[in-house]
Amino acid sequence: MPAILAKKLGMTQVFLEDGKVERVTVLEAGPCPVTGIRTIERDGYEAVQLAFGASKEKHLSKAELGHLKKAGAPPLRHVVEFRDEAGELQVGETVTVEAFEAGQRVKISGTSKGKGFQGTIKRHNFASGPKSHGSHNKRAPGSIGASAWPARVMKGIRGPGQMGNKRVTQKGLEIVQLDPQQNLMLVRGSVPGPRNGVVEVRTDA
């Protein structure tokens, strides 16, 4: 089961063979050198470690530079482990977009766009209150519990707070096109995170 790191370049649209227009997200996927292999015998679990994203040496620690140099990789900013994805890979090999096929289903994980502190209407899609007749609670959350009983706010009550900037995984996304020459992967629909954000792409079994 292949996995790869990618950078979200943005969205566009392509014409399919039947003439329909499909909106797609363009990902710059790889190349990702293999910088580590985890085994059950030595580490207690199976995983492959991939690196991605060119970086200057001054932005990496000596430990990071030493680890990458030992694997024969250039200075790279992002190092991520993928559980149960090692397969036949060895340290020093490179994973490219050619490990995937058009029409394949993948799941993509990334950090969603941060929205800051937001109220319940934007954060949880609550209905707004009355907007006329002197109402003062157009965007108020409403009751969060009675005073006599339960005399407290119950666990799990949705309220205002930090919105976004969390790890999100979208499943069942279809690969529409691949361009191995430019390391591009076109995925149907949207992908978590901002433009130029780094995402993890795995096959969706």
Regions found by a protein language model. Name each.
Residues M1-A205:
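Extended basic (Lys/Arg/His-rich) segments that typically form rRNA-contacting surfaces
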